[in-house]
Amino acid sequence: MESVGDVLKDHPSRFQYQDLVQQIVKDPDVAAFIQKESLSQEELNRSISKFNQYITERDKFLRGDTDYIARGYKPILVMNHGYADVSYEETPELIAAEKEVAIKNRLRLINLPASLTKASLAQVELDDLGRLPVFEKFFTFVEQYPEVRKGLYLYGDFGVGKSFMVAALAHDLSEKRGVSSTLLHYPSFVIDVKNAIGDGNVKNLVDEIKQAEVLILDDIGAEQSTPWVRDEVLQVILQYRMQEDLPTFFTSNFNFEDLEKHFAKGKNGNDETWEARRVMERIRYLAEETRLEGENRR
């Protein structure tokens, strides 16, 4: 602990010393601390240098001085074995910033704009009443998770905000439930999987995605699908998530009927309706078909 002499070295006079001590103990924060802790005279005497240090650090903090080194922390007074000491606690601003970082760290976006990490259900504009049913379902899912497990298959016209809505859902799941979500642009994922065939990394890619705590497949149906992708990639992911009861969400420009037609297009124009229905059975099990109404917001 610093000596009073070191702190008051520029005040050699006894009268100056007493005057400075009086200034220190009359400081509103210091006076409140002395009263709260019921400091004895001996404890008070041992604490003068720390009180002085506290006042100096507090004033730097309040002024936002550039030489204040404990950025994001504010000085506070605490008791330390019979005398006052200076400690530091996180500011509300730092706590909020750290919370937001933690929220974003639980959001994994693959081939989607980073700006989607800023989406939240609180930002959803409900001036268009067509968005209200989807908002209510997402809000309910967040409130009731993990008891509720079935996801949503969100379809609608181009540009109505489907990706924003599912990103907002993921953000609120992270913020309010501490849940990690993987959001991936499905057409780009299909390309990545095809490119991984050469290096034998397909299984690792599929395993990583299928095990996500919450999985959101964005823009399904827009990919250049093949029977192999449909049966050996997508179906494997969906089957695993069915078995493990893992929440799964989708966005698409297609409704269920049109998506089935998309999957039924086989090699060389063959009709593979039966294979397509197998995939659709799993999607229907995992997610409720819901249309997002609204104007093109792009």
PLM region descriptions:
Residues 183, 216-218, 247-253:
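Structural recognition of the conserved hydrophobic beta-strand(s) that form the central parallel beta-sheet
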Residues 194-246:
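Conserved nucleotide-sensing/catalytic segment adjacent to the nucleotide-binding pocket
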Residues 55-112:
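Interdomain "pre-motor" coupling segment immediately N-terminal to P-loop NTPase/helicase cores
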Residues 114-148:
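N-terminal pre-Walker A segment at the start of P-loop NTPase domains
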Residues 1-48:
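Intrinsically disordered, low-complexity N-terminal extensions of AAA+/P-loop NTPases
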Residues 170-182:
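Post-Walker A helix-loop "phosphate-sensing" segment adjacent to the P-loop in P-loop NTPases
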Residues 148-167:
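Walker A/P-loop nucleotide-binding motif
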